């Protein structure tokens, strides 16, 4: 069977909620990274046979944001586009969907990734269509309602993160220690220039005509400590252990890849960054959200005849610190192999883009280390898990 290779990968810096990227729409962020990925790959928009971009909350963004992004990236009208929503797994699922298309010989060159501007997600008035008639009306925050709330249990994702911490006996201190590690490692990686390979600067003109350049992740906290983290109150559950400190922020950002069939890359003389060897997905009861990536990883390893010891590096999205620590209990991986340059707690979690970010961070780190096998895994709302296996030569 044919194999898919990653030829290029680029992402924006991740901005804080209402931060440096608040005036840049999701499709604009997507256009920036798609254009950069094409330039890195040395192919034009005319060469692309399709694109798939993940985006979770599309309300108010206009029709098919992925096609808007593709046009901004210079792709012609003839290139078809899809916008995909698998909650936090959207950016990773966009890649695996394109992998399936390439392996099925439906395409040879595709662009995949994810984007989200959580700062630009609107509020909605549910009764506005037909009228509230009498009494107060509701102003609904679509970022929370469509992006961060379980549609089945009607609770914030943090509640399910708390459930996992209790079930798997993960202490508040362990979660805070992981959060501190995430910030420390991300700060060190940033200082050493490790994110320069993946980050493309965002240039934009502010409302007052002032040019702005954003080239660094905004959310890394260099000054945090265990004492500071320990003082934070639990969120969404008074007896819980999830806090604003051991959970990621609300962020803006995008990431994209150029994917090719192995044969097409060879024909064009392209040296791949990585080869996609397989992927897996899993679904669980909604409250078991944090465990889903762990079971997806185990399923992926079994499917490919591998053990956890065969994998050189893991990237597990830090939807909460409890997610990584729950997966450690399920998979049994060495935590020293996980999120070695920090994770979403420090870098940010723009929900539609995070799956793309963890995969490219994994690939570039394996490349720096001279190659190896890596797994990127992520949970998503309603307790689904996605995992991807890559090899860097």
From Swiss-Prot:
It holds the Pfam family Thiolase_N. It catalyses: 2 acetyl-CoA = acetoacetyl-CoA + CoA. Signal peptide: none annotated. It is found in: Cytoplasm. Its EC number is 2.3.1.9. The active site is at 88 (acyl-thioester intermediate), 349 (proton acceptor), 379 (proton acceptor). InterPro entries: Thiolase, Thiolase-like, Thiolase_acyl_enz_int_AS, Thiolase_AS, Thiolase_C, Thiolase_CS, Thiolase_N. GO terms for molecular function: acetyl-CoA C-acetyltransferase activity. One of its GO terms (biological process) is sporulation resulting in formation of a cellular spore. One of its GO terms (cellular component) is cytoplasm. Induction: Subject to catabolite repression. Keywords: Acyltransferase, Cytoplasm, Sporulation, Transferase. It comes from the Bacteria. The keyword Transferase applies. Belongs to the thiolase-like superfamily. Thiolase family. This is Acetyl-CoA acetyltransferase. It comes from Bacillus subtilis (strain 168).
